[in-house]
Amino acid sequence: MSAAKLDVGTRAPDFTLTDQDGASVSLSDFAGSKVIIYFYPAAGTPGCTTQACDFRDNINSLKSAGYQVLGVSKDTVADLKKFQGEQGLNFPLLSDLDLAVHNLYGAYGEKNLYGKTVTGVLRSTFVVDEAGDIRLALYNVKATGHVASLRKKLGVDA
């Protein structure tokens, strides 16, 4: 069973999660700002590392365009701290151990994995505007090339 997916134009659900440094981070902390929230299956795995490093390498152009990036996974705070350090990640990584926020955003549910239907994290990205509304809701994205595609959709130059 999959959680309900969010529609463009709806209010982004607020949440509070713990980041890689043990600090509480809420979506409402960024009120009045544009936020990219991306959900990924697991820190340190090949696809997730590719995607995280892609955000890292593009963070300056995204920030110049007014975007804050938040990565969300079901990893522990300790695993996120290790992942951040190993990859030099320059944006907050948030721990959602009980998958509550994944479910709020429809980023957990059934997916095809190597020809089998399994239940797990749906690699997803959301763009929240300054008013707190969903402007983009992208589900089942590919790790490789995703940030370039996202930049293009947002009109952000490299």
Show the residue positions of the predicted features:
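Chalcogenol-based redox active-site neighborhoods
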Residues: M1-A158
